[in-house]
């Protein structure tokens, strides 16, 4: 049985990842975001595009607007034997999305954003990639977030 879209923040993050991935593969912003949002939604049966949630649009727009600076931060935090070009499109997209939400999107606590992107990585990548993403992004969990969860 297929799990249907729930409109939760996790599902919206997953849709943001899907839209960003499609854009990396040459897709346009609005069609990629709309498709990712409507694809397995039960409401998609009515053939009318749904209004895209602000949270989804903010994530996709934010990553695209800050893509160059996100890539620079990722490059600086890779081991010297790695380059950003060597990363898979899935991993690169996950890192950008997670890093954006943790460092530039103040709506979500760092630890929540980290946990969410790791869960999405487990679904779309393998365990090695999820661990890699966790290792790189865990450097950006602020002390303020750590104090709240302890």
From Swiss-Prot:
Q: Look up the record and give one Gene Ontology term from the biological process aspect.
A: DNA-templated transcription termination
Assigned keywords, A-Z? RNA-binding, Transcription, Transcription antitermination, Transcription regulation
Any keyword Lyase?
no
**Molecular-function GO term, any one:** RNA binding
UniProt record similarity statement: Belongs to the NusB family.
Q: What does this protein do?
A: Involved in transcription antitermination. Required for transcription of ribosomal RNA (rRNA) genes. Binds specifically to the boxA antiterminator sequence of the ribosomal RNA (rrn) operons.
What name goes with this protein?
Transcription antitermination protein NusB
**Which species does the entry assign this protein to?**
Streptococcus equi subsp. equi (strain 4047)
Q: Which gene encodes it?
A: nusB
């Amino acid at each position: 049985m297929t799990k249907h879209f729930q409109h939760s923040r996790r599902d919206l993050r997953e849709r943001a990842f899907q839209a960003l991935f499609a854009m990396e593969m040459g897709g346009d912003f609005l069609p990629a975001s709309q498709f990712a949002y409507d694809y397995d939604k039960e409401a998609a049966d009515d053939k009318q595009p749904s209004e895209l949630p602000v949270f989804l649009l903010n994530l996709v727009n934010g990553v695209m607007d800050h893509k160059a600076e996100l890539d620079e931060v990722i490059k600086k935090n890779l081991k010297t034997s790695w380059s950003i070009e060597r990363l898979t499109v899935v991993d690169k997209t996950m890192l950008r999305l997670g890093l954006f939400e943790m460092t530039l999107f103040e709506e979500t606590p760092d630890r929540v954003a980290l946990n969410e992107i790791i869960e999405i990585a487990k679904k779309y990548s393998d365990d090695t990639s999820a661990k890699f993403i966790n290792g790189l992004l865990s450097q950006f969990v602020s002390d303020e977030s750590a104090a709240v969860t302890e």
